[in-house]
Every structure is written in structure tokens, then in C-alpha cells.
Amino acid sequence: MPKRDDIKTILVIGSGPIVIGQAAEFDYAGTQACLSLKEEGYRVVLVNSNPATIMTDAEMADKVYIEPITLDFVSRIIRKERPDAILPTLGGQTGLNMAMELSAAGILDECNVEVLGTDLTAIKKAEDREAFRDLMNELGEPVPESDIIHNLDEAYSFVERIGYPVIVRPAYTLGGSGGGICHNEQELIETVTSGLKLSPVTQCLLEKSIAGFKEVEYEVMRDANNNAMVVCNMENIDPVGIHTGDSIVVAPSQTLSDREYQLLRDVSLKIIRALEIEGGCNVQLALDPDSYNYYVIEVNPRVSRSSALASKATGYPIAKLAAKIAVGLTLDEVRNPVTGTTFAHFEPTLDYVVAKIPRFAFDKFEQADRRLGTQMKATGEVMAIGRSWEEALLKAVRSLEVGADHLLLEEAENADEETLERKICFPEDDRLFFLAAALRRGQTIEQLHEKTKIDLFFLYKLSKSIELENRVKENPQNEAILAEAKRAGFSDAFLATCWNIDEQAIYDLRKAQNLFPVYKMVDTCAAEFESTTPYFYSTYEEENESTRSAKESVIVLGSGPIRIGQGVEFDYATVHSVWAIQQAGYEAIIINNNPETVSTDFSISDKLYFEPLTLEDVMHVIEIEQPLGVVVQFGGQTAINLADGLAKRGVKILGTSLEDTDRAENRDAFEKALEILQIPQPAGKTATSVEEAIKVATDIGYPVLVRPSYVLGGRAMEIVESEEALKHYMTNAVKVNPKHPVLVDRYVSGQEVEVDAISDGENVLIPGIMEHIERAGVHSGDSIAVYPAQRLSQQVKNTIVDYTTRLATGLNIIGMLNIQYVVDGEEVFVIEVNPRSSRTAPFLSKITEIPMANVATRVILGENLIDLGYTPGLAPEKQEIFVKVPVFSFAKLRSVDTSLGPEMKSTGEVMGKDVTLEKALYKGFVASGTTMHDYGTVLLTVADRDKKEAVELAKRFNRIGFTIMATKGTASTLEEAEIPVSQVKKIGENQETLIDYIRNGQVTLVVNTLTTGKRPERDGFQIRRESVENGIPVCTSLDTAEAILRVLESRSFELESMNASEVKQPKVRV
């Protein structure tokens, strides 16, 4: 069937900011789709609110709108651009929900816009829990016994009939938001209340729990001719009951018999045909391990996280082909880009095993509930490929960057029996390590199977790894054992620990017996057809399929799994760096292990190595490729941390030298450099012991900012106000010793300013200066950034440009650097310099039209800024105003405090752009999911130090018609200032308290600043959590509250009676 020529313009809806449950996989899908549609000659219009994505680059679509994905803004774009069709199935849950809203509001009919890929009826049948259940009943496919509920009473009657445990699944939500398994009435009340609030249609499915069944997924494709095929099937190691995004996954499935595989395959194809989906679809099934009984769990009628994993696991580009199918092409007409000879309807065949392990942010959120269930909690994931399950699993473990290079975690090994049992029976993010610890202590695989319902096959494989571990320890430096261990995926670092020698000695042993990995190709067809895919994985076998080309090459290190502090921004920079290397005439090679990202799309680089980012694994690639050098500036802290080890092994680090990187990151060296350059910084010193830290703090005066050196995302950073608090931090948050010093600085509560710059060693280009709305003390990644700076004098800007130029040249930076300053009056202090790409680089690149990672790479490769056409100094500022607003995933992470401070907590970001700051902020807030009410009630409960400032804010809220509620202390201060206020009871008082008002929806905005001390801290935590659970915006910084207020004031009008001159009435604004 030829592609459609009756449509010319297609609107692609992106997925918005990165949140838990919806990460970089949709940047990958959207980028593929836009390029695929342009390839077919269509005019592509894209809307997405996330500036940190490749898909929002101007080259990706004919028109790119970085605007909020809301009914209001998308409708405006449709009316302006008049697309013939929209493609919503590549923008995750956000895209699907937007399409449903546009349809319900009548916009699609009004503007005569067709929905491509999967029609809205099919989306409704898959997403609406009741319609889905009815369809399955029609098809004769079993679903767990269930009921649709819209309130708690309906939930009670279902439980009376079925009994506990039950699973709650809210309709039209992402990553199982609001869902969970309930074992008792208390859990039922909490989960159902939360689920109904989070479902846009106030609907949940309550179903009988089938926890313990095997969970299997099929990634399927179908075209308009009803051709359907399976791209990949995947098996969750964890049984049903743990969200698939939080499960360890293996592809292809390892424990299904042929009969089981074919049974579930047939079901998946039957469902995609019944839904008449044109494109990709994910079917999740539960299989009884003791019979052939199965249940259909759910269907995602769109490209999903699993699609990205299936694409990378097989090499089959699902999103690219789904876009082609959406415009009428069929599977038997489109060539498979991997082989170039076969067509897309050939089902991929795998001659290797793929393991995916999720990455969690619990290192950032120590208070979070780590227990896994049906609501997703992982921020990202890693993937590894091997010839066996054991090899793939161990490669994935060392890709995680959780301080383990093997199935060995100190915490698990040292756990008492009670903790060990709890961690095994009630799964948390680190259960894999506790299973290994239990096997080491002599528990049998049958005992573990009984407790976990994990298939005996996987437990047997784990036990084999532990057995091999024991033989390694018993046979130091034995050649045969070494070879066996390497084939099983053991790392040199772990072997070195076993044999009590250093890692280099292991390498020398391997070199002596020529024991090195070879690289195999991912080709979708298990070598049945000729393939030229430049996509490789390592394994210990005979034949090597990766050959070095005659062209000089450069290796770029990726940033690994997405986590808080190191997100998709670094992947964005990696991809741009690769393109720049290719433009400069070199072969560009990527090493990375994240299946969600654009950088691991094999069509991006000349060669892709899907490998752990460890010294050993990277060195193997370097040895085979012999590159000109390695670029580490764009892979976040992951890549920077490898630079030292690589340089010691004789590898050329391109760009800023290792010594100069160390001068920026090592506190003492940095202080000396600042002294020479005569640039001020807040007073502070390095401490290598608790006593030393107390002395430094006493000398410079409290409050102080304390943090470990060499850190990304403000890990373990805190503002400390007393000696007692400092002692607590030093003993609990960090392991301080001479090797790992702690930095103690005077805390300057000024205005924070951030600068990204590019230096060629002589000239320095500053694309822009961004100011933060929140004052210093809130992590830069969690602050609202504004460009161009609105509150800085010309003198301060000149000082910042001068300091930035001096720092870049004085530290011999070649490439990118990011500097954070704090401005106090007209004084400018340097807080820190990062000699690498930053998380603001994509934002600044988009708005200044200076492709920073691209330019920096050209400079790293030896060109200079003037020859590249750039004038040194500050680039001319744009007329429009741009804001970068952080986005948080607090709703997914219960028991995490939402208060902002020096430790980063946001998972993503959005951009707002307009002609005034207020309009740009409005777009930013709306895009981030903040509900902007033009009237309502503001609840104020602030610390004593903030009360004076809160009076001014309350006056302004009152002036535009808001009612003010406050707790006793804050209310007294407001009454003294003659501001109308209703006093509410604190938590623990007998009558109706402020928590009741929040729960009953009587509050529209909460402003709550941190009080130090135990009780108020606990109360504040509960206020903030209740606000998040009930979807109420909560500001823990008065600066954020003021920004929201500015927006509300700009949307209100003056109202004054005509006879105001007779009796002076106060003005009211609405």
C-alpha cells in the first residue's frame, strides 16, 4: 500500500518533561518518528515542552514549538498550523491523553484533524479499564476478576466479595501512578483515594491479585493491511506485582516452553488485531508457572519504555517503522534499516541474551519508601548484552554505578538475618544483591523460590555465579578459572579483590594468555543475512566482528543510566558531540549502556558499543579501535570519573587536561587558582575529619554549606546552622577521610547566577548568563532559571564576563565549562566551576541558537572560536524571555520530603518563552504541571526568619482576591500588619487542622518554609507531603511563591469604584 498523499502536515505530540515512568525513551521515539516522516516528504510540526531533548532541535521538524502540552496551547498550535493529522502514539501517556482531550473538546473535528497510527476508539479500549475488560471478554481472553470503581464504597463492596490482596490500577495514568497492592483496609483507603485523584477520568480498576505469576511482555507491530508480527518478547525476573519498569527484565524470555511462547504470542497478535492498532503496541501478560493458565494484564497502545528496550535489544527501530506505518506504508514494503536487504515484517532473531536492570534514585532520597510494587519508582535503566544470562546480568550490574562491580553489596553481606529475610520477602531496589548474599549463606534456590516466586532457572543461574566465585577464591591466579570467570561476566575489579592483587595485575595475567573479549554485532537476524550494522557488544569468544576502519576515530563516553542530577541533558550533549566529530571528518564512536536514549540509536554514530562505562570495558574498546582520543566532557560525572584511570593507561583525553580538570574540582588547587586570578569566593576550607570541620565552621561563622568534593547533583550537600547539626551531617551523610575531604563554606544568601561558556584556550565565548529565581541554597537543577538575567546591573554582568574569561583561560579549559556565582549587592563570588557540559547546555543552546556541545567539540578537536565564526565575550542577548522550570516526581516517591535545598530532587525540566517574564513563567509553571488558580486560598506557614517577607507576599495575594489561611505564629504576624487572615490549627491539635483543609480541597496553594528543629520539621514534612498527594502546588521557597504571585498579578485587573474619590476604598484586583 503506497504512503498517503492526501495528508501534507502532521503534528507530532511529544511527551513533555522527564518524570518517573516517562523518561528519555520518548525523546528517542519522537526523534526517530520526526526524521522518519520527513524522510517520506511530510511537513512535520512538533510540540514538546522539554528543551533538553534532541527532538526539540530546530532540524528535527519543519516547525518546533517548545510550549506546554495542554489543551489550551496545543489547540492554539493546531489552529495556527492547520495540520491534516496528529500522531499522538510517540509521546507516551502525555501524547495519548492530549489526543483524547483534543477530541473530547471538539478541536479535532473543528479543525478537521485526523488521528494517525491508532484511532481514538482503540486508545479508549486499551486505556479505559472498563472498555478494555469488555473487549477481553468479547475476545474470550482471561483477565483477573475485577471491578471498575469511582469511589471508596464501590472499592469496599469489591473487597467484601473477593477478599485481600487486591491490585488498584488507575485509568489513563503513567507508570502505575496512584496504583498499588492492598493487603488491608488502611492500604485500600490510601491507594484508592490517591488513584482516583490521579486518574484524569476518576476511575480505577480493582482486581484480584495474581502476584506471583510470571510476567511476560510482547512488543508487537501491525499495519493497515492487518499484517502483524512480534518484534521481541521479554520476561520479567520479578513476578507479577512489581511494575515492569522496576523489574529486572531479560530478552528473549528464558523460561517459557515453546508451547507457552506460542500461546502468549498468538494472544498478543489477536489483541493488536482486535484493537486495529497501526504501529507499535506492548502487551503484558501473566502466566501461571504451574499450568498453561494466563491472564492479560494490560495493553499500551503506543510506543513505550518497553518499545525502546525492545528496539535496542533487537536493533529493530520500532518508533521509526511505527511512524511509516502510521502514514499507510506496510511492513512488507518497508526495508529493515539494520540489514538493508530484508523487510520489516521479518521477526527479529536473537543469538544473545539481553538484561535490563532499573536504576533508582534512593541514593538521593534516603527517607523514601524503597519497597517495590505496581507503582513505578525507577528513574532510569541500564541494558547489557552477553552470550549467556549470567554474563549479561553481571555486565548490567556494573553498568548501574551503585558502587558494585559484581553481585556483592557490602550492605547485603553485613545484614543481619532479619534484615536479609525482609529484603528477600518484601522486594526493594537492591533485592538482587540480597539474593546473592542469601545464596552465600547457604540458602537453597528452592527456599528462595518459595519466598520470592522468582523462577528456579534464574535462581539456579545466580547460584552458579556464586559457586564460580568460590572456585575463583580457592584458586588464585589459575588460568583456566580466570578464563571461565571472564566468560561468565566477572569483572577484573572483582577478580582483583578475590585474589588480593590490583586490577592491572589481572589485566597482565589476561594479556599473558591473550584473554580478551571479542565484539559481536547486533543484526536482528542472528547472522542469517548479511548485515552492516555498526552496533556491537563484547563477549569472550573466538571470532571478532568489529574491525577498525582506516579513518581516524574519536570515542565519546556516554552518561549511563538516567538518575537525578544526571539526566537526558548529558545525552543531548553526547549526540551533538558525535555529530560535530563527524562534521570534522572523523569517525565517531559511542560507548554507552542506556537503552532509552538517542545516543544508543545505532544510526547516530559510526559505531556504537553497548557496554558498561567502567575502566576495563572502555579500555577494551579503546584497544581495538585505537582512537585519536576520548571525549569525556559530555558524559556527566560518569565520564569525568573515568578520565584519571584512562590517562594513567596512556589514553589521550581530548579537551581540558586531567591536571586542569583537577584544578577546578579539587578544592585546595581551585583556591590557589582563584588567589592567582584574584577572583573572590565565599570563605571556606577543606576538612578531612569531624574536628577539623567544626573548627573551620567556627572560624568562618554559621550558617555553612557542607558537601563532599567531586560530586554531581548536590549529592549529600547541606546548609548547616549549628555545631550539633554539623556533627550529625559529618557522621551520617558522608564518610570523611583524607582521601575524601569535605568542603565547608560560608553560606552567602545572595542571588545565584549560572553561566555556560566555551573556551579554545585563548578566546572564551559566553552564550548567556542565567539568573535563578530562588536565592543561593537551592540546587541549581531545582531552581527556576531566567534568561536573559532580569535583575543584574550592567556592572555585575561585566564582572561575571570578566571572571568567566579569566577562569576559563587561567584554568586552561578547552571545551565547555559551567560556572555558578552568587551575587550579593554588587559583589560577585564564585561558588564552583565544572569543567564539562552542564544540564543547562541544551536550554541555552536552543534559546541562543549557539549549538554549544557542537562548538565545544570542534574546539576540543583543535579549531578556534574565531575561525568557527564566533566573537569572544558575551553573545548578544535575545529580546524574548526564557525560563527553565524544574519538574519533580514526588507523587511517585512517597515519604520523600518535597522541600528544596542544596541536594537536587528534580527529574526533569520544561521551558517557557514569551515577551514578558510573567508570561514566560506562566507557560513554564503550566508546562511543569503546576495548577495556576486565579483565585482561592493560600495557606501560609513559615519559619520565623521568613515572616517579615511573608507579610509583603500576603498583602499582594490579598490584593488580587485570595483568602489567606495561616498557622498561629504566621497568622499573628499578618494580623499585626492588618492583613485579613483565618487562623488554622496545627497538626496534633484536636479540632479541624490545616491537614483537613488540604485534604478537603479548600486550599489552592501552600507556602511552607523550613523550620529547624525536630517537631516543626516533622509537621512541615506532613504538610508538604499532603499537598503533593492532593495535587496542590507547594512552595518551600518564598522566591518561588513570589514568582507564582507575579504571574497571578499579571493575569488580574484593577477594580475600583467610580466614587472612590468620595470614600477612599482599598483597591481590589481580580
Curated annotation (Swiss-Prot):
Mn(2+) 4 binds at residues 832, 834. ATP 1 binds at residues 129, 169, 175-176, 208, 210, 215, 241-243, 284, 298. Residues 547-929 are annotated as: Carbamoyl phosphate synthetic domain. Mn(2+) 1 binds at residues 284, 298. Gene3D superfamilies: 3.40.50.20, ATP-grasp fold, A domain, ATP-grasp fold, B domain, Carbamoyl-phosphate synthetase, large subunit oligomerisation domain, Methylglyoxal synthase-like domain. GO terms for biological process: 'de novo' UMP biosynthetic process; glutamine metabolic process; L-arginine biosynthetic process. Pathway: Amino-acid biosynthesis; L-arginine biosynthesis; carbamoyl phosphate from bicarbonate: step 1/1; Pyrimidine metabolism; UMP biosynthesis via de novo pathway; (S)-dihydroorotate from bicarbonate: step 1/3. Residues 930-1070 form the MGS-like domain. Residues 1-401 are annotated as: Carboxyphosphate synthetic domain. Its cofactor is Mg(2+); Mn(2+). Keywords: Amino-acid biosynthesis, Arginine biosynthesis, ATP-binding, Ligase, Magnesium, Manganese, Metal-binding, Nucleotide-binding, Pyrimidine biosynthesis, Repeat. Residues 930-1070 are annotated as: Allosteric domain. One of its GO terms (molecular function) is metal ion binding. Coiled coil: none annotated. ATP 2 binds at residues 707, 746, 748, 752, 777-780, 820, 832. Mg(2+) 1 binds at residues 284, 298. InterPro entries: ATP-grasp, ATP_grasp_subdomain_1, CarbamoylP_synth_lsu, CarbamoylP_synth_lsu_oligo, CarbamoylP_synth_lsu_oligo_sf, CbamoylP_synth_lsu-like_ATP-bd, CbamoylP_synth_lsu_CPSase_dom, MGS-like_dom. Mg(2+) 2 binds at residues 298, 300. Composed of two chains; the small (or glutamine) chain promotes the hydrolysis of glutamine to ammonia, which is used by the large (or ammonia) chain to synthesize carbamoyl phosphate. Tetramer of heterodimers (alpha,beta)4. NCBIfam families: CPSaseII_lrg, PRK05294.1, PRK12815.1. The large subunit is composed of 2 ATP-grasp domains that are involved in binding the 2 ATP molecules needed for carbamoyl phosphate synthesis. The N-terminal ATP-grasp domain (referred to as the carboxyphosphate synthetic component) catalyzes the ATP-dependent phosphorylation of hydrogencarbonate to carboxyphosphate and the subsequent nucleophilic attack by ammonia to form a carbamate intermediate. This is Carbamoyl phosphate synthase large chain. It comes from Listeria welshimeri serovar 6b (strain ATCC 35897 / DSM 20650 / CCUG 15529 / CIP 8149 / NCTC 11857 / SLCC 5334 / V8). The lineage of its organism: Bacteria, Bacillati, Bacillota, Bacilli, Bacillales.
